[in-house]
């Protein structure tokens, strides 16, 4: 019998390839608590606990506003406190935060649009 067990799905996030976009994205993700596990001039691997994604210096226009990520956390209120204390909307162009609330699909979550235009559901 075939073993079709999956291990995980890992996403690539395009940072954009204009001057400074990749570096800004690297700084942003580190600021919100992700650790770099590998890094080149065009690629970075970020982890936090059991979560992982790849950041790639690649044009983002084709995906900007169309990519969503779900980050499930142990304590949403602690994450919200941390995110708001960082004043991300003031420091980074395009970043938007929406306070935690219960959505019609029954999940309490906060929303974050990051510097790459990725829409994060944090729950």
Question: What is the predicted role of each segment?
Answer:
Residues 25-29, 114-117:
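Conserved active-site tyrosine of GNAT-family acetyltransferases
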Residues 4-8, 61-66, 104:
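Short glycine-enriched loop/turn motifs at secondary-structure junctions
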């Amino acid at each position: 019998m075939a073993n079709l067990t999956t291990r995980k799905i890992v996403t690539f996030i395009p940072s954009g390839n204009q001057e400074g976009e990749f570096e800004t994205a690297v700084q942003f993700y580190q600021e919100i608590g992700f650790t770099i596990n590998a890094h080149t001039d065009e690629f970075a691997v970020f982890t936090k606990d059991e979560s992982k994604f790849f950041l790639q210096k690649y044009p983002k226009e084709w995906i900007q506003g169309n990519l969503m990520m779900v980050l499930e956390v142990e304590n949403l209120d602690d994450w919200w406190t941390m995110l708001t204390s960082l004043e991300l909307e003031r420091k980074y162009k395009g970043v938007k935060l929406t306070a935690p609330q219960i959505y019609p699909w029954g999940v309490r979550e906060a929303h974050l649009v990051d510097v790459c235009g990725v829409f994060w559901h944090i729950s």
